Amino acid sequence: MTKKLHIKTWGCQMNEYDSSKMADLLDATHGYQLTDVAEEADVLLLNTCSIREKAQEKVFHQLGRWKLLKEKNPDLIIGVGGCVASQEGEHIRQRAHYVDIIFGPQTLHRLPEMINSVRGDRSPVVDISFPEIEKFDRLPEPRAEGPTAFVSIMEGCNKYCTYCVVPYTRGEEVSRPSDDILFEIAQLAAQGVREVNLLGQNVNAWRGENYDGTTGSFADLLRLVAAIDGIDRIRFTTSHPIEFTDDIIEVYRDTPELVSFLHLPVQSGSDRILNLMGRTHTALEYKAIIRKLRAARPDIQISSDFIVGFPGETTDDFEKTMKLIADVNFDMSYSFIFSARPGTPAADMVDDVPEEEKKQRLYILQERINQQAMAWSRRMLGTTQRILVEGTSRKSIMELSGRTENNRVVNFEGTPDMIGKFVDVEITDVYPNSLRGKVVRTEDEMGLRVAETPESVIARTRKENDLGVGYYQP
């Protein structure tokens, strides 16, 4: 009888990536098949996120529902992973003694051994350590699920922003070697992946080891990924302004595979609040990065993160944030009301902004961003956009759906053979959450490259020094 696994995932794209790796790992080692129905499962895993408010209570509410399933089936294994597991550890079992496994983001690769241990002597297992890069060394080969894929290139963060739990739950920055990343992406490309999204809590801080023992930069890695045959689009998330260096901006100038869309969190437009947040950059420095980016790639669109109602935020501070939003003309944002995370420095600050004021500021900010996003969408009306076709439309099974470079969903009439390929679509209608278009060119008519070697990418990104000597630093 087939053994079944149910994974419930909350949080960021890194958590989604981790959950997919858990599923692949337990399929390879134990033959577990994924199910969307918790009642069918032999193993239940909850991959948690500590970013949102009341994250811990949300976990225990979910575990309470699963407790009823365990009472009916004592052999059921329940595991809790992710960032809340890292924060709470043994405390989870103190409140929910029926939980069998507690593991952190850096120990998910040990799940097979943990399950074997529980199956063997029924003793619970808690492992929330930080074994650095070992996690990636023990994961199964990647498996493509459509034309887009996420690839984690690093873990953790060294920035210690005062509101953020990531350094405490995922540890400090650890970069994967470049060869491991490139091999994983090449495997995905061979399975039909056309677009790859490089993941990291602070992805542009990547400093991985190269094959020759040298340390590579994120800009180097982007160019090498662009050289992989079949990869026609590259995205990455999430970046930090302090490490968005000029060499990364140069990649936007000479590497068309890198999309004209960037998510670059800023959090606030007030230097005073940025200082309290420990962001180590100013609003002016952030805008300088955007100016350089738009000089290199004039059509680039920017999204960001914002926190409103941070302790001490005044009306003047908030107005500075609104000015930054107008100056940069953000295309979209992830915006939140501040809520303290236990164990962070901001949790000890006086939360002196009234709740109603926080809600009002969030509403004003989101309305402005929505207006700007709609204005960006309207500019696309009548233009031709290249779409990576992901599958059938959610709105109609008779239509296809895909995404533009700037992450807009486009629905259009097409044929099944277009799925997984690029099409050029003329935008005919603009809606608040999507666009509509008609196909004007198929991939066969585009003349996309058939193959390109790393050497050819290096050749076309060749620079010359003051003496006229060409160079490229891999």
Curated annotation (Swiss-Prot):
Free-text comment on the cofactor: Binds 2 [4Fe-4S] clusters. One cluster is coordinated with 3 cysteines and an exchangeable S-adenosyl-L-methionine.
CDD domains from the UniProt entry: Radical_SAM
Requisite cofactors: [4Fe-4S] cluster
Claim: Iron-sulfur is one of the keywords in the record: yes
InterPro entries tied to this protein: Elp3/MiaA/NifB-like_rSAM, Methylthiotransferase, Methylthiotransferase_CS, Methylthiotransferase_N, Methylthiotransferase_N_sf, MiaB_methiolase, rSAM, rSAM_horseshoe
Pfam families listed in its UniProt record: Radical_SAM, TRAM, UPF0004
Protein name, entry field: tRNA-2-methylthio-N(6)-dimethylallyladenosine synthase
Annotated organism of origin: Escherichia coli O1:K1 / APEC
